[in-house]
Amino acid sequence: PLDRAPESGAAVVLLNSDELAHETALPGLDAVLHHTPSARDAHVCKAEVRSNCLSGTLALPRGRRDGTRLCCGYLVTKDRVVLVDDGEMAEPYLKHIVKEKRLIENSVGRFLYDFFELLIARDLHRLEEIEDRATALEERVLAGELEEFSTPMSELRKETMAWYRYYSQLDDVACELRENENGYFSDEECGLFRLFEERVIRLREESQLLREYCTQIQSLFQSEIDIRQNRIMQILTIVTTIFLPLTLLVGWYGMNFSGMPELHWKYGYPAIILVSVAVVAVSYTHLRAHETPEHL
């Protein structure tokens, strides 16, 4: 944190949540610092406009290696930006901006534009990776490999939904910046925020297409399952149709009434066998004649 106000130029202050909690005041930010959200409170992307500042949070759908999400809080005044980051989200972007010498004096808006642009710089590549995983899953379904489908499909659907929600929220943030209610940004900077908003909208459309693609793959999987179940039911129907007359025959002669002459006929047993074989042959021939070629 700063221990004195800068003499000139815009200042970017990077804190973590503990430093924010113990920092009672920063030079030039005494009246607004309490509006700064901590990184621990960052669960969505949002921007809240107040009379003397603009504050909000950023929460990325991707996370760190330990599985925790990349989040930060931020506060914007006319000449100052405060970022609250507990992990590895904001600091790498700040270093990149400094390295590329993009930190222009008296240009909070330009810094915010560069920062937000870095947030989405590789997102199209990440969405393409998700699409590749979805395509591989679709190819497995088409190849009849339906085992272990539900878990990766569920992960893909949750992931695409997270990215879509993220871009929808980020679009709202870009809209707040572009509207410039506090008058912090120049017309040129508002134009940059408009460009950023358009890129976010395109990424949101890409994520929506991925969501629809995952839904199509899920439908394809369900269709394959239904086809397999239909084949099983067809086999059971054929077996039942063939053996139902035999069941009737067995039940009929199983009553063993004394008045049944076939029971005492020496050819009765072979005759029943021949009748059963004939019934099976006739039933099978009839079913084959009425089956479509793909069911034979």
Predicted regions and their residues:
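Alpha-helical transmembrane segments of multipass membrane proteins
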Residues: V279-S283
